[in-house]
Amino acid sequence: MKEINIIGFGLMGRQISALFYLLGYEIGVYNKSKPNIYEFEKQIKLLQRKIDFSNFNAGKINIYQHIEDLKNSLTIESLNEDLNLKKEIIQIL
């Protein structure tokens, strides 16, 4: 299974995660606060109404409490537009 990490699980992070989930990826998610899985599921349903994913098997989502636990995979950052926060996260990676 292909893997991808998403840092930040706000609106954009949930949308990106939902798309990759429907494309069959194993997604590693890190968010400072508890991720809103209900909103993630809503994004999945919205995408399924707009795009035919019948040729794909659903992926898997893993929620991590610590950013250091993310796998060594392609990582998409979807944090707030706060330069200091982004620098802090990039230094950890």
Mark where each language-model region is:
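NAD(P)+-binding Rossmann beta1-loop-alpha1 motif at the extreme N-terminus of oxidoreductases
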Residues: M1-K50, N62
